[in-house]
């Protein structure tokens, strides 16, 4: 009996350890940034000539457009990324779907509501309706609707989309919603082929497809219910055959973005309640971050799906100036969003950086230590140069709004805003991406002894000291005050302040 009891206790202890390990991996703040759980072996990739991308093809729906970047291009395939841009018109509903790969959504413009349906989580929103029936029957019938939390999104929001989690978006504003989606095909959550697959729960993709600069093709795709037998489906769901046919989307030509004529009737708490809920959610988030950073009893480490998964925040605004990581009043601001600030990114294994450069401001040259980067221009123009390990310029051009540039891991990049300034967002293929700067505070030059710099570049110690310290305490975004005139030194330009 003692042996059996000891065996059961050992099994119980192992289960607790496994449970804690899996939850800590997903939600714990102490994540190793040098480790990136992306699959896919090494392949021969040629990044010797980068190019700026724009959407290659578009699919029109009843109330919007989906634009696809060239997923067959070698640069997208080598980085394991897939990018689309969606435009949802007012009162447009992006029908529920889920994907085989995790992703991030950046709201370029517009506002609306969205829902993410996490499996196994309780329905926390409850609403009662009163339905009036025809004469001769009882005058009204009450029924109650329950569903998971509805989130409101606005311009500048980042939305995390874990693989296999159903979601929908609705435009409740007066202007179109424009959103950029970036998916990670090489994430370990994807156990299918390294290709983006959307599983539609409603609607279809039987719409005409326009190839930019090419011929028109037909894009075909049904929702998941269309593949089931009608009788089996109606029996499984407890509905009649007509409803089952509607679920299958037969003869439905609206596409994947449909128009809701009278608008969605959504249950939302009042503004004061929303603020209170947001505050409680932030407190809970901070609480379990502290919880996993401290030593606790094993029995409290695996305390249920609801606390760690169902209440996790799925949306965060990256354009809020108060959230900026670095700010220079004469150059701009940089905001980074990683799993430390946004724990759900441990599931998605992506991160984002929002950069707002003022007039003629320049970024310190840098490289991405542990991730590829996808740079999308939101406003303005930027002069960009990218250099490979061979010291060759693989990109040298001006990026304009709507263009996307893939910057491979370790390639050095230099960006300078044009006279109207520049705003861009970059998506990184690591939940805790890191960059290494060449100039300014906390840079490579600052970390090196003066003699190392002087001998490496055959310059005097005074020149090496100037090279090491001439940017003072500036970090990231630099004011446009230095212009190289000769090999020996630098001279000041006029310092013009630029407003956002």
UniProtKB/Swiss-Prot annotation:
Disulfide bonds join 45-78, 121-310. It comes from the Eukaryota. Residues 50-245, 316-465 form the Cupin type-1 domain. One of its GO terms (molecular function) is nutrient reservoir activity. Residues 1-24 form the signal peptide. Hexamer; each subunit is composed of an acidic and a basic chain derived from a single precursor and linked by a disulfide bond. This is Glutelin type-B 5. The lineage of its organism: Eukaryota, Viridiplantae, Streptophyta, Embryophyta, Tracheophyta. The gene is GLUB5.
